[in-house]
A protein has these predicted regions:
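Membrane-embedded alpha-helical signal segments
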Residues: 1-224
Length: 224
């Protein structure tokens, strides 16, 4: 039990150990075989931004051993995506095979909890309403409570051998992942496009809101 708790803690905070020095070390190691690729990646995106991207990936449990794939995605999408968050999402798509492999069973099946369209729309509305607000206050209180209730109920009934992923639309994936992390729920969130072709999805539940959220309440954001 102690070993599992330690592993969860290290995984949860792993991103905090990735900075410019660590990014530079990874790039230096890559230069041995991919010097031109490293040079082009650093030309397109600053070292500071590369460090931020790696930090995002590590904090979401994405393996960064596939640095060639990461750098190729940076070269391809870096000129078009000024946001580190959006560029990180592009890199995740390029790493669909690695992400799927990390979370799938040995038979290449991904047990999953699927976000329903009403939930995704509620998350989009929350994102629009919180664009100019602090990140931690972006989730409306009723939506946060409803989500927390659903996840706690499902986790209590979940078979200990089952480790599901959460699947949601790409534009709300990061927000849902951040919310789960803030509430100490250690589940990876994948976008549909991140499921590699050779893997299959096993839907075991749909994430449904228990009842419509009153409009007046939904506008009051929770500082969670």
């Amino acid at each position: 039990v102690l070993e599992r708790c330690l592993e969860r803690t290290l995984t949860r905070y792993a991103g905090e150990f990735v900075g410019i020095q660590e990014a530079r070390a990874l790039l230096y190691k890559m230069e041995t075989h991919y010097a031109e690729l490293v040079t082009e990646a650093v030309r397109v995106v600053s070292l500071q931004k590369i460090a931020e991207i790696l930090r995002r990936l590590v904090s979401e449990g994405v393996p960064v051993r596939a640095m060639r794939t990461i750098l190729e995605a940076i070269v391809a999408w870096g000129p078009q995506e000024s946001s580190s968050a959006r560029l990180s999402d592009r890199i995740r798509l390029a790493m669909a095979r690695q992400i799927s492999h990390r979370h799938a069973r040995s038979d290449r099946v991904l047990p999953a909890w699927i976000a329903t369209r009403p939930l995704e729309e509620a998350l989009r509305t929350a994102q629009r309403n919180s664009e100019n607000q602090p990140v931690r206050s972006g989730m409306p209180a009723p939506l946060s409570r409803a989500l927390n209730g659903w996840f706690q109920q499902q986790l209590e009934a979940l078979d200990s051998d089952l480790q599901p992923v959460v699947v949601a639309a790409s534009d709300v994936r990061a927000a849902l992942q951040q919310w789960l992390k803030q509430h100490d729920i250690d589940l990876p969130v994948m976008a549909w496009q991140e499921i590699a072709p050779e893997f299959s999805l096993q839907a075991i539940a749909q994430i449904r809101l228990p009842k419509p959220i009153p409009r007046r309440e939904s506008e009051a954001t929770a500082k969670l």
